[in-house]
Amino acid sequence: GVEPQTGMRGVTRRTIAACWLAVSLGLANATALGQARTVYYSGFEPGQDYDAEYTLIDQDGWQGKGTGGNGLVEDNFEGLGQQGYIGFWPPEEDGETFTSLWRPVEGIDPEETKVTFTVLMMIIASTNGQRDDFRWGVYNDNAQRLVTLDFDNETRNINYALDDNIFLPTGYTFENEALYELKFVMDFAANNWSVSVSDEVLLNSKTLTTTGASLTFGDLGPLWVYRKPETPGNNYMVFDEYKLTVETSDEPVKTPPTLAWTGWTDDGRAMLQMGGDATTDYTVEVSDDLKTWTPLETAKPGDTWKEITDPEAPDYEQRFYRARTAD
């Protein structure tokens, strides 16, 4: 492959085999089962008005945050022309901790709640002794981060985080200079997501939001997180054949939970009304500092709403409540 040029702007370890590429490449442009519709595709080629003299940010609707390296390279993936990349060049501004890229997608119908993302990717090792993290992050249309898949270039572990910001191991590792096809399947009606590399499922039916965030697709893009912001590595991630398809979900769209304050009982308990999908279990959680959340009650709203009470509320100066789909 060719290095980027300066742009004018605790679980069993299972290494994903690069030989899977032979079968995955042929699937990169395949039509998904059912009535999947492509809402965005990029091969990052000159024919799509991509210019390797410039950063990827501001080309074909791509946006970004941070001043770290990003742009286009040629023939890192043999026979596939140009690729996008993030990394390699250190940020131009002091104090930055990451550079991120995303490409907003419009025109998804409300009933198209199942979103599939595929991309070819490769992480190139550092030669300066510093190794960073490369991630793919999913955001909803309110710019709230839902889920993250993390490729830790220090340990080569693949980790993930839900919107509680706690990173957990998938149990898989990756290799540098190996070409993978990454696939996200997100079902916003069912509030779940899965990730695979070719035939290997890394995560299956994990929760998209644990905090009651809006279950809508906004964007999905790469991040370069500097492990030592003052001395980032010259590692970088190359990606190509970026594709998003949408289709209707098999799951009916469920109403998100709601909470309303209704006052105090005669014996001093706080009273709340919980609404939502009649047959879905929701967990109401309570906190006094917005950091540590404790389950209060799990219940179904029924056809109208469910009354929730908190007998310990009088013992606290302040009390916060939230509802989420039960595990």
Model segments located where?
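Extracellular beta-strand elements of beta-rich domains used
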Residues: 44, 240-244
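Short tryptophan-centered beta-strand motifs in secreted/extracellular beta-sheet-rich domains
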Residues: 117-119, 178-188, 193-195
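Secretory/extracellular carbohydrate-interaction modules
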Residues: 47, 80-157
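Bacterial N-terminal signal peptides
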Residues: 17-28
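Short, aromatic/His-centered strand-loop micro-motif at the edge of beta-sheets
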Residues: 159-181
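Short, composition-biased motifs enriched in small/polar/acidic residues
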Residues: 251-327
